[in-house]
């Protein structure tokens, strides 16, 4: 995944970046997960779905740190700016409900 995630221009690279960040987070390494997410944000990718998934993961990281304010900001920004017809809207609503918003 690390090798694949280096080329964010491809859909496979963007997905690999997300999957690797999710792996880090799931295994208690939120620092490396957040670092990888920030790299993707700074580098950019044309694959908006995987970028949106990374922002949701960033919200999950903040929720795990009890920083619901920051998580809410990421989720509301994504809600207002992401318009594709896929599962992202449902993920956003689940997390907003989870933090009581």
Task: Briefly describe each language-model feature range.
Residues 1-101:
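Acidic, polar-rich low-complexity tracts and alpha-helical solenoid repeat scaffolds
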